[in-house]
């Protein structure tokens, strides 16, 4: 977030955590919050949704920007269902609607996220612009400047801060 601060989030099948300059200590993600983080990660990146969601159902067809798109309903565990629109020709995820359960507020926050500016990166379609909007924080825009493969990271970046 540049001069406004930073957030580090790591999620695996078994654990997850968030650390930021806003909170004095890291926050472990457990139960539904860990599942929710895994779902959000799967929607942001290209993953096999059938490995993440309990059900994925086509519920309709719509036209977006003169293109045919399938409307999907997805569920996992006890989380609220997610509605998504997928381009029928390219398979690009155009947008999704989900209620994000905030661990601090304890209430679901309806959120709509659009994915735009898809580009091919070594055979994988990647959205280089992601726009998320909700009533509490307004609109957040994520833009990818560069997408690289085979980047080496210090493995400690992915450990929970208390486990270093």
Q: Where are the model-predicted features located?
A:
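Short, solvent-exposed secondary-structure boundary motifs
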Residues: 1-3, 43-54, 73-77, 104-109
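Short linear motifs in intrinsically disordered
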Residues: 6-9, 59-63, 119-123
